[in-house]
Design a protein with these regions (language model features):
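Proteins enriched for Cys/Gly/acidic motifs involved in redox and nucleic-acid/cofactor modification
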Residues: 1-194, 201-204, 250, 272-283, ...
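Active-site proximal loops enriched in glycine and acidic residues that flank catalytic Cys/His/Asp
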Residues: 10, 187, 225, 254-256, ...
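Hydrophobic, well-ordered secondary-structure elements that form the walls
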Residues: 252, 293, 313, 321, ...
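Contiguous mid-protein beta-loop-alpha structural module that forms a pocket-lining wall or clamp
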Residues: 301, 317-318
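Short, conserved loop/helix-junction motifs that constitute active-site signature segments
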Residues: 67-69, 240-244, 317
Length: 430
């Protein structure tokens, strides 16, 4: 009998991506064949609810899956399932909800009638073998204790909790042994990491990063999103001590560059405090690139407040910006705030912010010409630099992707694409 065919569809954030990869590897370990959705007997959809648009994409993905001629079952998991599963269950009796992502593989067995007393957890090495990733996400934290007025994720993900230190180190070592050139530490609120050591001591994010440097040989580590108020001098100094092994990159979800807007959002810092944090980063990590999330059109955002936000982004000089139009989420405080911004105003502000983002990305890339950076060769001649810019390598002779190498940045084209050459013994190759 042929093994049932399964497809895993991921929607949403980097944390979801890491969780979907693990679900895929769990299913492969059980002998299921992973295929494209149109060929599947069962489709797993890891859902996202961060915005109204994300929820709409989830419903569309489920309807699309149900429409395939093979009439597959659809197992849904993730944030939408944790908030209001009935919206998906009412679409068909072929839709099955599984709130616990670690139990998805077992639920798949149940739906398809495959005997399994329990589903063993897979290792990160098996994830790499199954998915062929050039970098591996290591989830070290989940949940959020903040209550930002626009956000519904804390309801979907629950309170903050952290993976124990020894478990994180084991995952990193497995990735290293599998030949992964870079791991990315991920979490819903990464800077709130508060794991327990083997001796039951509390360990914060900077101490965890130091432990990874001292107790593993992983070639390269990247930190994903860290809230601005969680950026500490201690964390930055750890990053500065290991410039060859820690990517000089931080993603800071500033959300707005206007203090009045930040206050209505329930963000625990001012625009001035954010810029103080940026100055501290620049002082300790002068070559670091900074990316951000920014929301336009939050309730009550005036033209003047938007201009303040745009001006801050220009002053900081972000290398990458994720620009979101405010999305009204039922059950949040912001949904009932007065002075909701008209859609056409949001659209224009989004256009201007995205235009600025493109200009800033190119400017940051161009200031790096002549610098040497660590980079991951992903495939072909495609590189991801330590600064998280995408680049093309001029010569891949003798290289097998994925791999880590030093490159010299030699140019940037008008689209912002970086061009690089291999660095040998501290000088450009002739």
């Amino acid at each position: 009998m042929l093994a049932p065919h399964i497809s895993v569809v991921n929607l949403g954030c980097r944390v979801n991506r890491v969780e979907s990869d693990r679900i895929t590897a769990d299913l492969m370990r059980l002998g299921f064949a992973i295929v494209e959705p149109q060929d599947a007997d069962l489709i797993v959809i890891n859902t996202c609810a961060v915005t109204g648009e994300a929820e709409a994409k989830t419903r569309k993905a489920v309807r699309h899956a149900l429409a395939y001629p093979g009439e597959p079952y659809v197992v849904v998991t993730g944030c939408v399932v944790n908030l209001h599963p009935e919206e998906l269950l009412e679409l068909s009796d072929r839709v099955i909800a599984e709130p616990s992502k670690i139990d998805v593989a077992e639920r798949v067995c149940e739906v398809l009638g495959v005997e399994s007393d329990s589903v063993p957890a897979c290792s990160d090495g098996e994830v790499v073998d199954a998915l062929g990733r050039s970098r591996l996400g290591v989830k070290i934290q989940d949940g959020c204790n903040h209550r930002c007025t626009y956000c519904i994720v804390w309801k979907a993900r629950g309170p903050e909790r952290s993976v124990p230190v020894e478990s994180v180190l084991e995952q990193v070592r497995e990735a290293q042994e599998a030949g992964v050139p870079e791991v990315v530490l991920t979490g819903v609120n990464l800077g709130a990491y508060d794991g327990k050591s083997a001796t039951d001591e509390h360990v914060e994010i900077d101490e965890l990063l130091e432990a990874i440097m001292e107790r593993t040989s992983i070639p390269h580590v990247r930190i994903s999103s860290v809230e601005p108020m969680d950026i500490s001098e201690r964390l930055l100094k750890v990053m500065a001590r290991y410039p060859q092994r820690i990517a000089p990159f931080l993603h800071l979800p500033v959300q707005s560059g206007c203090t009045a807007t930040l206050h209505r959002m329930g963000r625990p810092y001012s625009a001035e405090a954010f810029e103080d944090t940026v100055r501290m980063i620049r002082a300790i990590l002068p070559q670091a690139s900074l990316s951000c999330d920014v929301i336009v059109g939050f309730p009550g955002e005036t033209d003047e407040e938007f201009e303040e936000s745009l001006a801050l982004c220009r002053r900081v000089g972000f290398s990458r910006m994720h620009v979101f139009r405010y999305s009204k989420r039922p059950g949040t405080l912001a949904a009932d705030m007065p002075d909701q911004v008209p859609p056409e105003v949001m659209a224009e502000r989004s256009r201007r912010m995205r235009a600025a983002a493109q200009e800033l990305a190119i400017a940051d890339a161009r200031r790096r010409v002549g610098m040497v950076e660590r980079a991951v060769l992903e495939y072909g001649d495609n590189l991801t630099l330590g600064s998280f810019h995408h680049a093309r390598l001029d010569d891949t002779c003798g290289l097998t992707a994925p791999c880590l190498l030093d490159v010299a940045i030699i140019g940037v084209d008008d689209s912002g694409l970086v061009h690089a050459r291999r660095e040998v013994h501290g000088s450009l190759e002739d």
